[in-house]
Every structure is written in C-alpha cells, then in structure tokens.
Amino acid sequence: MEMQDQSKINLGIVVSEFNYDITSLMLQRALSHAEFLGVTVKVVVKVPGSYDMAVIVKELLKRDEIDGVVTLGAVIKGETKHDEIVATQTARKLMDLSVEYGKPVTLGIIGHGVTHEQAVERIEEYSMRAVESAVKLIKRLKKLREIDLTKETNVSIE
C-alpha cells in the first residue's frame, strides 16, 4: 500500500464507545491535536469496545487513502482479569495488523489495571501521544522507503 505525500498525512481514528465518558474526551483531544499538527483525519469509526477494534482497523489499513490508524479506548480494571485479557489481546492484534499492512496503528488505549480516576488523568497524554506517534511513524516510514541503501550508509532517520 502506498502512503500519501509526506506533507499530506491522512489518518483514521477508531474509538471505543465503552467508557465513553473517557473516550469521547480522548477523541476530542486527538482531533484537536491532529489539526494542530496539520494532518487530516479522514474518518472516525466508533466501535462497541476496544476488543472490537481490530476488524475496523484492518478495513481502514486496506485503503490507500489512509496512512495510519489511531486507536482510542479505556480498559478499566474490574473484579476479574477481564481487563488484562482485553487489553493484551487487543494490543497484540493491532500490532500484528500494523506489521501486516506496513502502516502505523498507534495504541491510544488506556489500561489495563487502571481505575476510572487514573484513566481520566491520562486522557490528554494518551490521545495526543497516539496521534503524534502515528504522524512520526508515517513520516519516518516514507523516508525509509525512499532511501536507496545500496548507495547510502550511516543513514539516520528522525
């Protein structure tokens, strides 16, 4: 899949509706930060929960007009290890999709093992970091793909 011109970065955002009092604020922060960075959010897709993200992320990664995907969610600790299972399996699958499609999928999912209060404290940090990481990775992947390593050595990409 080809990525767009470096000056025009197009993102998709997938946001969980579970714990929406938190994730709706994460979405607002992510959209504001994307605008601040000068990148375009082509589509926002809401899914029931973080565990449900992978199928939507995969569909977005298939599209040439999407350079990377930001995921936003909050997996709050409960009475069982359910939060750990959800967070671990979701992160693993999202990383697998990123590698499979050669496009960044960034993890703006708070948790596991956090309380509601801890998640609220992390809204801004996780949202902004997920967008920033996607933009940095897209730019660096583009540079890496343009370099002819048969002709250049000691290359540093930042």
Swiss-Prot record:
GO CC entries: riboflavin synthase complex
EC number: 2.5.1.78
CDD domains in the cross-refs: Lumazine_synthase_archaeal
GO biological process, one term: riboflavin biosynthetic process
GO molecular function: 6,7-dimethyl-8-ribityllumazine synthase activity
Annotated metabolic or biological route of this protein: Cofactor biosynthesis; riboflavin biosynthesis; riboflavin from 2-hydroxy-3-oxobutyl phosphate and 5-amino-6-(D-ribitylamino)uracil: step 1/2
Residue positions of the active site: 82 (proton donor)
Xref: InterPro entries: LS, LS/RS, LS/RS_sf
UniProt keyword list: Riboflavin biosynthesis, Transferase
Domain of life: Archaea
Chain residues that bind (2S)-2-hydroxy-3-oxobutyl phosphate: 79-80, 122
Binding site for 5-amino-6-(D-ribitylamino)uracil: 18, 50-52, 74-76, 107
EC class (word): transferase
Catalysed reactions, semicolon-separated: (2S)-2-hydroxy-3-oxobutyl phosphate + 5-amino-6-(D-ribitylamino)uracil = 6,7-dimethyl-8-(1-D-ribityl)lumazine + phosphate + 2 H2O + H(+)
Stored NCBIfam families: lumazine-synth (TIGR00114)
Function, as annotated: Catalyzes the formation of 6,7-dimethyl-8-ribityllumazine by condensation of 5-amino-6-(D-ribitylamino)uracil with 3,4-dihydroxy-2-butanone 4-phosphate. This is the penultimate step in the biosynthesis of riboflavin.
Family of the protein in this entry: Belongs to the DMRL synthase family.
Protein name: 6,7-dimethyl-8-ribityllumazine synthase
Species per Swiss-Prot/TrEMBL record: Sulfolobus acidocaldarius (strain ATCC 33909 / DSM 639 / JCM 8929 / NBRC 15157 / NCIMB 11770)
